[in-house]
């Protein structure tokens, strides 16, 4: 085997070992392989081949990523931002978030209740603190308002609706 063939095979083996652990984006995989000393001239053709073979799939990565972040209680804004940082295209992000079938309003409400309890905030300062918490978690302003309004409605209906 030629030197170029051996180098290309080494890159492929390293990439497959990384992909065996978890899904990666093309950018993540290229960065990890470069940090391990692999020549970028060999990395990019190998990544192309892996993508053509279906072994490197950013859509699949994004689906797994969205599921894990939803389980952690993160909102769509933060999830999209993190996917962009990892090099996932906006079209893929939009598609995956839409296909995730997450009720973001219910998610925001559940995250708020898990952190602060089901009661209504005692004052404006507490309401602001809760809203800022939800925004940091990646929920939109509309989702934050809806979660706060749901707490108000629950409080007015009492514990038995």
UniProtKB/Swiss-Prot annotation:
Entries under SUPFAM superfamilies matching the protein: Winged helix' DNA-binding domain (SSF46785)
Cellular localization per UniProt: Cytoplasm
Pfam family, one: RecX_HTH2
Gene3D superfamilies registered for this protein in UniProt: Winged helix-like DNA-binding domain superfamily/Winged helix DNA-binding domain
Principal location class: cytoplasm
Any GO BP annotation: regulation of DNA repair
Keywords (A to Z) from UniProt: Cytoplasm
A Gene Ontology term for the protein's cellular component: cytoplasm
Cited function: Modulates RecA activity.
Family of this protein: Belongs to the RecX family.
NCBIfam families: PRK00117.5-5
Name of the protein this chain belongs to: Regulatory protein RecX
Species: Halorhodospira halophila (strain DSM 244 / SL1) (Ectothiorhodospira halophila (strain DSM 244 / SL1))
